[in-house]
C-alpha cells in the first residue's frame, strides 16, 4: 500500500523474501486491542482478528503515538518478541529523558539546560555560551531545532516564545559543539554489537547533518572506543536496535541522541551493509534462543 511506501519497508520486504520469512506491515492506528479475554490479550486489525506474530519489529521510532506504544506492549504480553520494547522506544523518543539516563550513567553528553518556563538568558550564557541550540524534546529528521548564533537571535527567539499563546514546555537548550558543527557520526547497533558507522555532513551552509535533510554520508572507521560507547548507550536505554549519533567534541566523543528506529538508506549507501538482513538474522537468533530456554513439556 502507498501508506507503507518507504525505502526501509521495501528493503525489509526484500530481505524477508530472501530468507523465506513472512513479513506483514501494520499501521498501529488501525488496531483494536482487547484485554480481559479468556484467550488473553487479543487484537483486531481493520476489523479482522490479528494473531500475535512471532516477532514484532517496531519501526515507529520518534513518531510513536500512544497507540503505537500500546500495540508494542500488547504484543509483548501476548508472547511476541518485540524489537524494540515499548519502554525503550518511549525513552529514546524523549531526547531529554535519553540525555538524563545517559548522564546519570556517566556517559558524555553535551551541556544541556531544561526548565518548565523560559530560561534566563544569563543562565544560558553562563552554562552553554553562544551559539546554542533550542531543541524539541521529541523530534526526528533534524526537525524542531533552532540555532541561535548571538544574543540578539536568542532574545528574538525568547521573545517569540514568550508571546506564544501556548508557551512550549517541551524544549531543552543545548551547547553547540563547534568542533562537530555540521557533522556527526551515526553508529548502528543490533543486539549488543555495533555493526557499522558512517560520517554525516550537513549540506553546504547548513548545520544539521541528517541525511534526510540533504546531508552527505561516508563510511567511518568503527574504532573499539566508538563501538563500545554506542553499544553502552543503546543498552542503557534497553534498545536491541539503535542508531546512536555522536559528536566529535574537543574533549572526546559525546552522545547527541539515540534513535530506536533509525532510517538506514544513507547508512547502507555509506557502509554497504544489509541492515534488514542483519536485523532479521538477529531476530531469528533471538527466537531460537528463546525456544531453547523454554521449559519442555513432560510426556
Where are these regions (language model features)?
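ATP-binding N-terminal substructure of ATP-dependent carboxylate-amine bond-forming enzymes
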Residues: 1-83, 88
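A conserved helix-loop-beta module that forms one wall/lid of the active-site cleft
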Residues: 21-27, 72-144
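Short acidic-glycine loop/turn motifs at beta-strand connectors
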Residues: 37-39, 189-193, 249-251
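Glycine-rich phosphate/pyrophosphate-binding beta-alpha loops
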Residues: 62, 141, 259-271
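Protein kinase-like catalytic core scaffold
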Residues: 132, 172, 195-196, 242, ...
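Phosphate-binding site of ATP-dependent enzymes
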Residues: 146-234
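A short beta-strand motif that forms the metal-chelation/ATP-contact edge
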Residues: 187-189, 252-266
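A long amphipathic alpha-helix within ATP-dependent nucleotide-binding catalytic cores
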Residues: 206-255, 276-297
Amino acid at each position: 500500500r502507498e501508506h507503507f511506501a518507504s525505502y526501509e519497508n521495501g528493503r525489509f520486504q526484500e530481505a524477508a523474501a530472501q530468507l523465506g520469512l513472512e513479513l506483514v506491515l501494520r499501521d498501529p492506528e488501525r488496531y483494536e486491542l482487547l484485554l480481559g479475554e479468556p484467550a488473553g490479550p487479543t487484537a483486531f486489525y481493520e476489523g479482522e482478528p490479528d494473531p500475535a506474530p512471532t516477532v514484532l519489529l517496531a519501526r515507529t521510532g520518534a513518531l510513536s503515538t500512544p497507540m503505537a506504544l500500546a500495540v508494542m506492549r500488547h504484543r509483548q504480553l501476548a508472547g511476541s518478541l518485540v524489537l524494540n520494547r515499548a519502554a525503550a522506544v518511549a525513552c529514546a523518543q524523549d531526547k531529554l529523558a535519553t540525555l538524563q539516563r545517559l548522564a546519570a550513567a556517566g556517559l558524555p553528553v553535551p551541556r544541556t539546560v531544561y526548565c518548565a518556563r523560559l530560561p534566563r538568558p544569563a543562565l544560558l550564557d553562563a552554562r552553554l555560551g553562544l551559539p546554542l541550540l533550542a531543541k524539541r524534546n521529541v523530534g526526528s529528521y533534524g526537525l524542531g531545532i533552532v540555532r541561535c548564533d548571538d544574543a540578539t537571535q536568542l532574545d528574538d527567539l525568547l521573545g517569540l516564545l514568550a508571546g506564544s499563546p501556548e508557551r512550549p514546555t517541551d524544549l531543552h537548550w543545548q551547547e553547540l559543539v563547534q568542533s562537530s558543527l555540521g557533522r556527526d557520526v551515526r553508529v548502528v547497533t543490533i543486539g549488543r554489537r555495533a555493526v557499522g558507522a558512517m560520517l554525516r555532513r550537513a549540506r553546504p551552509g547548513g548545520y544539521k547533518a541528517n541525511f534526510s535533510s540533504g546531508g552527505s554520508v561516508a563510511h567511518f572507521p568503527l574504532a573499539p572506543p566508538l563501538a563500545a560507547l554506542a553499544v553502552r548507550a543503546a543498552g542503557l536505554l534497553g534498545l536491541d536496535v539503535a542508531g546512536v549519533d555522536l559528536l566529535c567534541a574537543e574533549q572526546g566523543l559525546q552522545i547527541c541522541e539515540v534513535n530506536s528506529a533509525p532510517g538506514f538508506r544513507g547508512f547502507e549507501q555509506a557502509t554497504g551493509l544489509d541492515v534488514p538482513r542483519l536485523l532479521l538474522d538477529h531476530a531469528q537468533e533471538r527466537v531460537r534462543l528463546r525456544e531453547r530456554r523454554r521449559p519442555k513439556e513432560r510426556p
